[in-house]
Amino acid sequence: MLHIRHILFLLLICLAAMPSTAQRLKTNKKLLRTVAQSQQASAAQYKLLMQQLPLDRFPVTYYEKTRKLVTSGSEPWVGGFYPGALLYLYEGTKDTALFNEAMRKLGPMEKEQFNKTTHDLGFMMYCSFGNAKRIAPRPEYDQVLINSARSLCTRFSEKVGCIRSWDSDAARFMVIIDNMVNLELLFAATRLTGDSTYYKVAVTHANTTMQHHFRPDYSSHHLVIYNPATGAVSKKQTVQGASDSSAWARGQAWGLYGYTVMYRETKDKKYLDQANHIAQFILRHPNLPADKIPYWDFNAPGIPNAPRDVSAGAVICSALFELAKYVDGRTARTYFKAAESMLQAMCSPAYLAAAGTNGGFLLMHGVGNYPRNADIDVPLIYADYYFTEAMRRYQQW
Protein backbone atom coordinates (compact mmCIF):
# COMPACT_ATOMS: atom_id res chain seq x y z
CA MET A 1 0.00 0.00 0.00
CA LEU A 2 2.82 2.40 0.88
CA HIS A 3 4.49 1.59 -2.44
CA ILE A 4 1.30 2.44 -4.35
CA ARG A 5 0.88 5.70 -2.42
CA HIS A 6 4.48 6.61 -3.21
CA ILE A 7 3.88 6.01 -6.92
CA LEU A 8 0.68 8.08 -6.87
CA PHE A 9 2.50 10.90 -5.07
CA LEU A 10 5.24 10.91 -7.71
CA LEU A 11 2.64 10.93 -10.48
CA LEU A 12 0.96 13.97 -8.95
CA ILE A 13 4.31 15.75 -8.70
CA CYS A 14 5.02 14.98 -12.36
CA LEU A 15 1.60 16.22 -13.45
CA ALA A 16 2.06 19.44 -11.51
CA ALA A 17 5.42 19.99 -13.17
CA MET A 18 4.07 19.49 -16.69
CA PRO A 19 3.76 22.66 -18.76
CA SER A 20 0.26 23.98 -19.39
CA THR A 21 -1.33 23.62 -22.80
CA ALA A 22 -0.61 27.29 -23.45
CA GLN A 23 3.07 26.69 -22.72
CA ARG A 24 3.13 23.68 -25.04
CA LEU A 25 1.48 25.49 -27.96
CA LYS A 26 4.12 26.32 -30.54
CA THR A 27 4.31 29.21 -32.93
CA ASN A 28 4.43 28.45 -36.64
CA LYS A 29 7.85 29.18 -38.13
CA LYS A 30 6.37 30.17 -41.47
CA LEU A 31 3.93 32.56 -39.84
CA LEU A 32 6.75 34.02 -37.73
CA ARG A 33 8.64 34.78 -40.94
CA THR A 34 5.50 36.32 -42.41
CA VAL A 35 5.07 38.47 -39.31
CA ALA A 36 8.69 39.67 -39.49
CA GLN A 37 8.23 40.55 -43.16
CA SER A 38 4.97 42.34 -42.35
CA GLN A 39 6.72 44.36 -39.66
CA GLN A 40 9.37 45.47 -42.13
CA ALA A 41 6.71 46.38 -44.68
CA SER A 42 4.77 48.22 -41.98
CA ALA A 43 7.87 50.17 -40.97
CA ALA A 44 8.31 51.30 -44.58
CA GLN A 45 4.65 52.36 -44.73
CA TYR A 46 4.90 54.40 -41.55
CA LYS A 47 8.01 56.14 -42.82
CA LEU A 48 5.86 57.39 -45.69
CA LEU A 49 3.08 58.36 -43.30
CA MET A 50 5.33 60.25 -40.90
CA GLN A 51 6.55 62.51 -43.70
CA GLN A 52 3.00 63.84 -44.07
CA LEU A 53 2.43 64.65 -40.40
CA PRO A 54 3.20 67.96 -38.71
CA LEU A 55 4.37 67.62 -35.12
CA ASP A 56 0.95 68.22 -33.58
CA ARG A 57 -1.12 66.09 -35.98
CA PHE A 58 -2.00 62.40 -35.62
CA PRO A 59 -3.24 60.04 -38.34
CA VAL A 60 -6.85 58.86 -38.20
CA THR A 61 -7.74 57.44 -41.63
CA TYR A 62 -7.23 57.89 -45.36
CA TYR A 63 -9.83 58.33 -48.13
CA GLU A 64 -8.56 56.70 -51.29
CA LYS A 65 -11.09 58.31 -53.64
CA THR A 66 -10.09 61.84 -52.71
CA ARG A 67 -6.51 60.99 -51.68
CA LYS A 68 -7.20 62.70 -48.36
CA LEU A 69 -5.21 61.95 -45.22
CA VAL A 70 -7.45 62.61 -42.21
CA THR A 71 -5.58 63.75 -39.11
CA SER A 72 -6.47 65.03 -35.66
CA GLY A 73 -4.92 66.89 -32.79
CA SER A 74 -3.99 65.12 -29.57
CA GLU A 75 -7.39 65.45 -27.92
CA PRO A 76 -9.54 62.81 -29.75
CA TRP A 77 -9.56 59.21 -28.58
CA VAL A 78 -7.28 57.98 -31.37
CA GLY A 79 -4.21 60.11 -30.58
CA GLY A 80 -2.23 57.50 -28.66
CA PHE A 81 -2.49 54.72 -31.23
CA TYR A 82 0.07 56.09 -33.69
CA PRO A 83 2.98 56.45 -31.22
CA GLY A 84 1.98 53.11 -29.70
CA ALA A 85 2.04 51.34 -33.06
CA LEU A 86 5.40 52.92 -33.86
CA LEU A 87 6.80 51.53 -30.61
CA TYR A 88 5.52 48.01 -31.30
CA LEU A 89 7.06 48.15 -34.77
CA TYR A 90 10.32 49.46 -33.31
CA GLU A 91 10.41 46.45 -30.99
CA GLY A 92 10.02 44.11 -33.94
CA THR A 93 12.36 45.85 -36.39
CA LYS A 94 14.82 47.82 -34.22
CA ASP A 95 14.40 50.67 -36.68
CA THR A 96 15.31 53.76 -34.66
CA ALA A 97 13.44 56.07 -37.04
CA LEU A 98 10.22 54.58 -35.69
CA PHE A 99 11.30 55.06 -32.09
CA ASN A 100 12.32 58.66 -32.73
CA GLU A 101 8.98 59.44 -34.37
CA ALA A 102 7.13 57.92 -31.42
CA MET A 103 9.14 60.06 -28.99
CA ARG A 104 8.43 63.13 -31.12
CA LYS A 105 4.70 62.47 -30.87
CA LEU A 106 4.68 62.04 -27.10
CA GLY A 107 5.32 65.77 -26.69
CA PRO A 108 1.97 66.94 -28.10
CA MET A 109 0.17 64.11 -26.27
CA GLU A 110 1.54 65.00 -22.84
CA LYS A 111 -0.98 67.75 -22.06
CA GLU A 112 -3.86 65.28 -22.34
CA GLN A 113 -2.94 63.86 -18.93
CA PHE A 114 -5.08 66.67 -17.49
CA ASN A 115 -8.00 66.20 -19.89
CA LYS A 116 -11.09 65.48 -17.79
CA THR A 117 -13.55 65.73 -20.67
CA THR A 118 -12.90 62.26 -22.09
CA HIS A 119 -13.29 58.65 -20.98
CA ASP A 120 -10.64 57.56 -23.49
CA LEU A 121 -7.49 58.38 -21.53
CA GLY A 122 -6.52 54.72 -21.44
CA PHE A 123 -6.46 54.58 -25.23
CA MET A 124 -4.80 57.96 -25.47
CA MET A 125 -2.17 57.77 -22.73
CA TYR A 126 -1.58 54.11 -21.91
CA CYS A 127 -1.16 53.07 -25.55
CA SER A 128 1.40 55.85 -25.96
CA PHE A 129 3.12 56.57 -22.64
CA GLY A 130 2.44 53.10 -21.28
CA ASN A 131 4.33 51.52 -24.16
CA ALA A 132 7.05 54.14 -23.94
CA LYS A 133 7.52 53.33 -20.24
CA ARG A 134 7.69 49.63 -21.03
CA ILE A 135 10.31 50.01 -23.76
CA ALA A 136 12.40 52.99 -22.61
CA PRO A 137 11.37 53.92 -19.04
CA ARG A 138 11.68 57.50 -17.82
CA PRO A 139 10.49 58.82 -14.44
CA GLU A 140 8.37 61.48 -16.11
CA TYR A 141 6.28 58.82 -17.84
CA ASP A 142 5.13 57.53 -14.46
CA GLN A 143 3.73 60.92 -13.50
CA VAL A 144 1.98 61.30 -16.85
CA LEU A 145 0.25 57.95 -16.33
CA ILE A 146 -0.70 58.79 -12.74
CA ASN A 147 -2.13 62.17 -13.71
CA SER A 148 -4.02 60.57 -16.59
CA ALA A 149 -5.57 58.04 -14.21
CA ARG A 150 -6.55 60.83 -11.81
CA SER A 151 -8.25 62.68 -14.64
CA LEU A 152 -10.10 59.54 -15.70
CA CYS A 153 -11.32 58.90 -12.16
CA THR A 154 -13.00 62.32 -12.04
CA ARG A 155 -15.56 60.83 -14.42
CA PHE A 156 -16.45 57.98 -12.05
CA SER A 157 -19.83 57.95 -10.31
CA GLU A 158 -20.18 55.92 -7.13
CA LYS A 159 -23.96 56.03 -7.55
CA VAL A 160 -23.80 54.46 -11.02
CA GLY A 161 -20.65 52.43 -10.44
CA CYS A 162 -19.13 53.45 -13.77
CA ILE A 163 -16.94 55.97 -15.55
CA ARG A 164 -19.05 58.31 -17.68
CA SER A 165 -18.42 58.03 -21.41
CA TRP A 166 -20.26 60.83 -23.20
CA ASP A 167 -21.04 64.29 -21.81
CA SER A 168 -23.67 65.30 -24.37
CA ASP A 169 -26.57 65.05 -21.89
CA ALA A 170 -25.99 65.66 -18.17
CA ALA A 171 -29.37 64.09 -17.35
CA ARG A 172 -28.27 60.76 -18.82
CA PHE A 173 -25.16 58.93 -17.58
CA MET A 174 -23.92 57.21 -20.72
CA VAL A 175 -21.46 54.30 -20.63
CA ILE A 176 -20.12 52.49 -23.70
CA ILE A 177 -18.46 49.08 -23.83
CA ASP A 178 -15.28 50.71 -25.19
CA ASN A 179 -14.61 51.97 -21.65
CA MET A 180 -13.49 48.48 -20.63
CA VAL A 181 -10.21 48.97 -22.49
CA ASN A 182 -9.45 52.23 -20.66
CA LEU A 183 -9.30 50.46 -17.29
CA GLU A 184 -5.77 49.14 -17.86
CA LEU A 185 -4.50 52.66 -17.16
CA LEU A 186 -6.03 52.55 -13.67
CA PHE A 187 -4.27 49.32 -12.75
CA ALA A 188 -0.99 50.88 -13.86
CA ALA A 189 -1.66 53.86 -11.58
CA THR A 190 -2.22 51.60 -8.58
CA ARG A 191 1.07 49.81 -9.29
CA LEU A 192 2.90 53.13 -9.58
CA THR A 193 1.40 54.78 -6.49
CA GLY A 194 0.30 51.98 -4.19
CA ASP A 195 -3.09 53.73 -4.05
CA SER A 196 -5.87 51.15 -4.41
CA THR A 197 -8.44 53.79 -5.37
CA TYR A 198 -7.68 53.36 -9.06
CA TYR A 199 -7.92 49.57 -8.76
CA LYS A 200 -11.29 49.83 -7.02
CA VAL A 201 -12.69 52.16 -9.68
CA ALA A 202 -11.64 49.72 -12.41
CA VAL A 203 -13.17 46.73 -10.62
CA THR A 204 -16.42 48.57 -9.87
CA HIS A 205 -16.76 49.74 -13.47
CA ALA A 206 -16.07 46.23 -14.80
CA ASN A 207 -18.61 44.67 -12.43
CA THR A 208 -21.33 47.17 -13.32
CA THR A 209 -20.65 46.71 -17.02
CA MET A 210 -20.76 42.93 -16.68
CA GLN A 211 -24.14 43.20 -14.99
CA HIS A 212 -25.83 45.55 -17.45
CA HIS A 213 -24.09 45.56 -20.84
CA PHE A 214 -24.32 41.87 -21.68
CA ARG A 215 -27.18 39.80 -23.03
CA PRO A 216 -27.87 36.15 -22.09
CA ASP A 217 -25.77 34.96 -25.07
CA TYR A 218 -22.85 37.16 -23.86
CA SER A 219 -23.08 39.57 -26.76
CA SER A 220 -22.87 43.18 -25.68
CA HIS A 221 -24.84 46.35 -26.14
CA HIS A 222 -22.74 49.30 -27.21
CA LEU A 223 -24.32 51.85 -24.85
CA VAL A 224 -26.09 51.64 -21.51
CA ILE A 225 -27.74 54.82 -20.20
CA TYR A 226 -28.11 55.19 -16.43
CA ASN A 227 -30.05 57.62 -14.28
CA PRO A 228 -27.23 59.64 -12.66
CA ALA A 229 -29.29 60.27 -9.51
CA THR A 230 -30.33 56.68 -8.81
CA GLY A 231 -27.92 54.51 -10.80
CA ALA A 232 -30.85 52.69 -12.42
CA VAL A 233 -30.60 51.60 -16.05
CA SER A 234 -32.74 53.81 -18.31
CA LYS A 235 -31.99 52.42 -21.76
CA LYS A 236 -29.73 50.07 -23.72
CA GLN A 237 -28.63 50.82 -27.27
CA THR A 238 -26.15 49.77 -29.93
CA VAL A 239 -25.38 53.13 -31.47
CA GLN A 240 -22.66 52.01 -33.88
CA GLY A 241 -24.26 48.65 -34.64
CA ALA A 242 -26.94 47.46 -37.04
CA SER A 243 -29.68 47.67 -34.40
CA ASP A 244 -30.10 47.87 -30.64
CA SER A 245 -30.38 44.07 -30.54
CA SER A 246 -27.37 43.38 -32.77
CA ALA A 247 -23.77 42.50 -31.91
CA TRP A 248 -21.56 45.33 -33.17
CA ALA A 249 -18.26 43.61 -33.93
CA ARG A 250 -15.85 46.13 -32.43
CA GLY A 251 -18.00 46.31 -29.32
CA GLN A 252 -17.60 42.57 -28.82
CA ALA A 253 -13.86 43.02 -29.37
CA TRP A 254 -13.61 45.75 -26.72
CA GLY A 255 -15.43 43.55 -24.22
CA LEU A 256 -13.18 40.57 -24.91
CA TYR A 257 -10.02 42.64 -24.59
CA GLY A 258 -11.22 44.45 -21.48
CA TYR A 259 -12.21 41.38 -19.47
CA THR A 260 -9.02 39.59 -20.47
CA VAL A 261 -7.10 42.52 -18.95
CA MET A 262 -9.35 42.42 -15.89
CA TYR A 263 -8.40 38.80 -15.25
CA ARG A 264 -4.70 39.53 -15.79
CA GLU A 265 -4.76 42.37 -13.27
CA THR A 266 -7.00 40.84 -10.58
CA LYS A 267 -6.84 37.03 -11.09
CA ASP A 268 -10.57 37.04 -10.29
CA LYS A 269 -12.05 34.03 -12.06
CA LYS A 270 -15.33 35.76 -12.85
CA TYR A 271 -13.47 37.97 -15.32
CA LEU A 272 -11.83 34.96 -16.94
CA ASP A 273 -15.25 33.34 -17.22
CA GLN A 274 -16.63 36.51 -18.81
CA ALA A 275 -13.77 36.72 -21.31
CA ASN A 276 -14.30 33.05 -22.19
CA HIS A 277 -18.00 33.58 -22.74
CA ILE A 278 -17.35 36.53 -25.05
CA ALA A 279 -14.66 34.63 -26.97
CA GLN A 280 -16.98 31.69 -27.47
CA PHE A 281 -19.79 33.97 -28.66
CA ILE A 282 -17.43 35.41 -31.27
CA LEU A 283 -15.73 32.22 -32.42
CA ARG A 284 -18.89 30.12 -32.56
CA HIS A 285 -21.01 32.71 -34.30
CA PRO A 286 -22.46 31.37 -37.56
CA ASN A 287 -21.72 34.67 -39.30
CA LEU A 288 -17.99 34.66 -38.52
CA PRO A 289 -16.17 34.33 -41.87
CA ALA A 290 -13.64 31.59 -42.56
CA ASP A 291 -10.66 33.92 -42.02
CA LYS A 292 -12.28 35.08 -38.75
CA ILE A 293 -12.10 38.78 -39.63
CA PRO A 294 -15.66 39.77 -38.72
CA TYR A 295 -18.25 41.74 -40.59
CA TRP A 296 -18.77 45.18 -39.05
CA ASP A 297 -21.72 43.74 -37.12
CA PHE A 298 -22.38 40.05 -36.50
CA ASN A 299 -26.00 40.72 -37.49
CA ALA A 300 -25.27 43.12 -40.33
CA PRO A 301 -27.73 43.19 -43.21
CA GLY A 302 -26.31 41.94 -46.48
CA ILE A 303 -24.00 39.25 -45.10
CA PRO A 304 -21.91 37.83 -46.82
CA ASN A 305 -21.58 41.06 -48.80
CA ALA A 306 -21.46 43.34 -45.77
CA PRO A 307 -18.17 45.19 -45.12
CA ARG A 308 -15.60 43.55 -42.89
CA ASP A 309 -14.10 45.44 -39.96
CA VAL A 310 -10.42 44.65 -39.68
CA SER A 311 -10.18 46.86 -36.58
CA ALA A 312 -12.48 44.47 -34.71
CA GLY A 313 -10.42 41.57 -36.04
CA ALA A 314 -7.15 43.08 -34.85
CA VAL A 315 -8.47 43.71 -31.33
CA ILE A 316 -9.93 40.19 -31.10
CA CYS A 317 -6.71 38.63 -32.41
CA SER A 318 -4.53 40.41 -29.87
CA ALA A 319 -6.92 39.59 -27.02
CA LEU A 320 -7.07 35.90 -27.95
CA PHE A 321 -3.29 35.58 -27.87
CA GLU A 322 -3.36 36.80 -24.29
CA LEU A 323 -6.47 34.90 -23.24
CA ALA A 324 -4.97 31.64 -24.54
CA LYS A 325 -2.34 31.94 -21.80
CA TYR A 326 -4.96 31.91 -19.05
CA VAL A 327 -6.88 28.80 -20.09
CA ASP A 328 -5.92 25.21 -20.68
CA GLY A 329 -6.51 22.21 -22.87
CA ARG A 330 -8.65 22.43 -25.97
CA THR A 331 -9.80 25.96 -25.12
CA ALA A 332 -6.26 27.35 -25.19
CA ARG A 333 -5.61 25.65 -28.51
CA THR A 334 -8.87 26.98 -29.96
CA TYR A 335 -8.02 30.57 -29.02
CA PHE A 336 -4.42 30.32 -30.15
CA LYS A 337 -5.27 28.77 -33.51
CA ALA A 338 -8.06 31.28 -34.12
CA ALA A 339 -5.69 34.15 -33.39
CA GLU A 340 -3.08 32.61 -35.70
CA SER A 341 -5.67 32.40 -38.46
CA MET A 342 -6.62 36.04 -37.98
CA LEU A 343 -3.00 37.16 -37.91
CA GLN A 344 -2.26 35.19 -41.08
CA ALA A 345 -5.19 36.90 -42.78
CA MET A 346 -4.13 40.37 -41.67
CA CYS A 347 -0.59 39.76 -42.91
CA SER A 348 -1.92 38.73 -46.33
CA PRO A 349 -2.59 41.01 -49.33
CA ALA A 350 -6.30 40.72 -48.54
CA TYR A 351 -5.81 43.15 -45.63
CA LEU A 352 -2.17 44.35 -45.50
CA ALA A 353 -1.73 47.27 -47.86
CA ALA A 354 0.82 47.14 -50.65
CA ALA A 355 3.85 49.38 -50.34
CA GLY A 356 3.11 53.03 -51.01
CA THR A 357 -0.68 52.62 -50.94
CA ASN A 358 -3.43 53.12 -48.34
CA GLY A 359 -2.12 56.55 -47.40
CA GLY A 360 0.73 54.97 -45.45
CA PHE A 361 -1.59 53.04 -43.13
CA LEU A 362 -1.02 49.33 -42.63
CA LEU A 363 -4.39 47.57 -42.82
CA MET A 364 -7.25 47.97 -45.27
CA HIS A 365 -10.98 47.34 -44.76
CA GLY A 366 -11.87 48.97 -41.47
CA VAL A 367 -15.28 50.33 -40.51
CA GLY A 368 -15.55 53.34 -38.23
CA ASN A 369 -19.26 54.13 -37.84
CA TYR A 370 -21.48 52.39 -40.37
CA PRO A 371 -24.85 53.81 -39.24
CA ARG A 372 -23.51 57.33 -39.76
CA ASN A 373 -21.93 56.35 -43.08
CA ALA A 374 -18.58 57.39 -41.65
CA ASP A 375 -15.25 55.73 -42.43
CA ILE A 376 -16.49 52.62 -44.23
CA ASP A 377 -13.93 50.32 -45.86
CA VAL A 378 -10.99 52.54 -44.95
CA PRO A 379 -7.77 52.21 -42.95
CA LEU A 380 -8.08 53.06 -39.26
CA ILE A 381 -5.21 53.91 -36.94
CA TYR A 382 -6.60 51.79 -34.11
CA ALA A 383 -6.70 48.77 -36.44
CA ASP A 384 -3.00 49.34 -37.10
CA TYR A 385 -2.24 49.60 -33.39
CA TYR A 386 -3.83 46.31 -32.37
CA PHE A 387 -2.36 44.61 -35.44
CA THR A 388 1.15 45.66 -34.40
CA GLU A 389 0.40 44.50 -30.85
CA ALA A 390 -0.87 41.13 -32.09
CA MET A 391 2.30 40.64 -34.15
CA ARG A 392 4.48 41.31 -31.11
CA ARG A 393 2.41 39.03 -28.89
CA TYR A 394 2.85 36.22 -31.38
CA GLN A 395 6.60 36.77 -31.60
CA GLN A 396 6.87 36.77 -27.81
CA TRP A 397 4.67 33.70 -27.26
What do these predicted regions represent?
Residues 1-30:
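Bacterial Sec-dependent N-terminal signal peptides
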Residues 23-397:
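Glycan-recognition and catalytic cores of secretory/periplasmic carbohydrate-active enzymes
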